[in-house]
Design a protein with these regions (language model features):
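Generic hydrophobic-segment detector
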Residues: 8-9, 131
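Bacterial N-terminal signal peptides
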Residues: 9-16
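A short, compositionally biased domain-edge/stem linker segment
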Residues: 16-22
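A short, solvent-exposed, low-complexity linear motif enriched for acidic/polar residues
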Residues: 22-185
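Positively charged n-region of N-terminal signal peptides that target proteins for export
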Residues: 1-5
Length: 185
């Protein structure tokens, strides 16, 4: 009796061990692209944006105290925004990440280097992009693409302000289909 109980216990443990943790968490593709909305970008011959990190915030669940922003490195790290105006966009991040619901996004910019066309001088550009409240899901074996529409605005007629980079809007695609757009249109 003891021997059959030991064999049964061993087999039960092997079955439980084999079924647990073999497959990792499901993943989906998350891609971030940037483009410039035509405002004061025409003043520049080049505007190099260096991205530090792409950061997303999971929606808080039952363990809300364990929820923290997830950081990802951008690749390529530097993009010349003058080359991505209108419908053209630059891919700055693409990776498989764990599925889930998210409610925030932040594009952390390390530096901005602008060179003016007419004056042939470097021009400082202030980054005003901060965290954005944005609900989206990463589905298993699906693709979520976020296209950020940035804009450079000329405030030089309001000294001491100069050029500023801000977020004009975004487009959110799920499996190639547009699901959200701000501003609408």
């Amino acid at each position: 009796m003891m021997r059959s109980l030991a064999i049964f216990s061993t087999l039960l443990l092997l079955v439980l061990w084999a079924g647990s943790g073999v497959a990792g968490p499901e993943q989906g593709i998350f891609e971030v692209r940037i483009k410039d909305h035509r405002e004061a970008i025409d003043d520049f011959s080049r505007l190099i944006l260096t991205v530090d990190k792409v950061v997303i915030s999971p929606k808080p669940g039952l363990k809300f105290w364990q929820t923290s922003w997830k950081e990802f490195s951008a690749s390529p790290a530097s993009v010349d925004l003058t080359k991505y105006i209108g419908k053209d966009s630059a891919k700055i991040f693409r990776a498989d990440i764990d599925v889930g619901a998210f409610d925030g996004f932040h594009l952390k910019i390390k530096s901005l280097e602008g060179f003016l066309k007419k004056a042939q001088l470097n021009a400082p550009v202030k980054n005003t992009i901060g965290p954005v409240k944005l609900s989206f899901d990463i589905a298993p074996r699906g693709e979520t693409v976020l296209v950020l529409d940035l804009t450079v605005i000329d405030f030089s007629d309001h000294p001491p302000r100069g050029y500023e980079l801000s977020l004009k809007g975004y487009e959110l695609y799920r499996n190639g289909k547009l699901v959200d757009k701000i501003p609408p249109g």
